[in-house]
Amino acid sequence: MLNQSQQAEPFHSGEIFHLWSFLLSTKEYLVTLQVLNNHAGDQDLKDFLDDIYENGYTPEEEQVENILKNAGLRLPPAPPDRPNVEVEDIPAGARFNDPEIANLIQRELMVSKMICSYIMGICVQEDIKNLFGEFHT
């Protein structure tokens, strides 16, 4: 991920803070996606949630976690995974409905793009900037 010349350069405090914060929020959001998947009734929505979990947020989590590990930094805590439940087992008054889930996902995707743009703007290391550029797309 980091090339040899940039790997020798230390991270500045903003890069460390934002890498660590991004990893923490991604770990928390992965658990949120598990909960929302339990609440979703529409199969297309469940498939979409599975896709962004497996192909969107999980690879981002792994890449940022590897950067922090390789830098010798302590990783943020991860909340425990949630068990799979059937949507019918969730009381109607406690259940998110499908339009609410879709709106929550839309909001998170937009916020993620803004955060990635901000991190790209403050990064000194080109490889980190490029990584968040990939996350942005």
What are these regions (language model features)?
Residues M1-H18, D81-Q106:
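Acidic/His metal-coordination segments adjacent to aromatic residues that form catalytic metal sites
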Residues M1-Q43:
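The feature marks the first
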Residues Q4-A8, N66-P79, V85, T137:
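Hydrophobic alpha-helical segments
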Residues F11-L19, Q43-T58, E100-I101, E126-H136:
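Alpha-helical scaffold segments that form or flank carboxylate-/histidine-based iron centers
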Residues K27, D50-T58, E62, Q106-K113, ...:
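Generic structural signal for well-ordered, non-transmembrane alpha-helical segments
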Residues Q43-P80:
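Conserved alpha-helical segments that form or flank metal/cofactor-binding pockets of metalloenzymes
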Residues E108-T137:
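Preference for long, well-ordered alpha-helical segments
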